[in-house]
Amino acid sequence: MGWSCIMLFLAATATGVHSQVQLQQPGAELVKPGASVKLSCKASGYTFTSYWMHWVKQRPGRGLEWIGRIDPNSGGTKYNEKFKSKATLTVDKPSSTAYMQLSSLTSEDSAVYYCAR
């Protein structure tokens, strides 16, 4: 069997009228099937703990799928049932960074992932 990999593209979006609000994610990730990956989303320009952080998936040619959200203040999470065993959302308050860990990766996980305030 040949070596294969999974490509994850990362993007970010922020709502609101303040142009200084930024959500920064690194570029693409290349991982092996069965592995896990931790995606990051660093926020700036607003009070990180005042807004939920959402994560969304978009596969080529398909619509957006809401994965879940986390309250950076309390750490409380809510997940789309479909992603409960796939995604784990966490935050690091001191660095104003949200994380999403995806486990047991398959070709179905090859997508663009957005963090959104």
Swiss-Prot record:
Residues 20-49 are annotated as: Framework-1. InterPro entries: Ig-like_dom, Ig-like_dom_sf, Ig-like_fold, Ig_V-set, IgHV. Residues 55-68 are annotated as: Framework-2. Disulfide bonds join 41-115. PROSITE patterns: IG_LIKE (PS50835). It comes from the Eukaryota. Residues 69-85 are annotated as: Complementarity-determining-2. Residues 86-117 are annotated as: Framework-3. Keywords: Adaptive immunity, Disulfide bond, Immunity, Immunoglobulin, Signal. GO terms for biological process: adaptive immune response. Residues 50-54 are annotated as: Complementarity-determining-1. Coiled coil: none annotated. Residues 1-19 form the signal peptide. One of its GO terms (cellular component) is immunoglobulin complex. SMART domains: IGv. This is Ig heavy chain V region 1-72. It comes from Mus musculus (Mouse). The lineage of its organism: Eukaryota, Metazoa, Chordata, Craniata, Vertebrata.
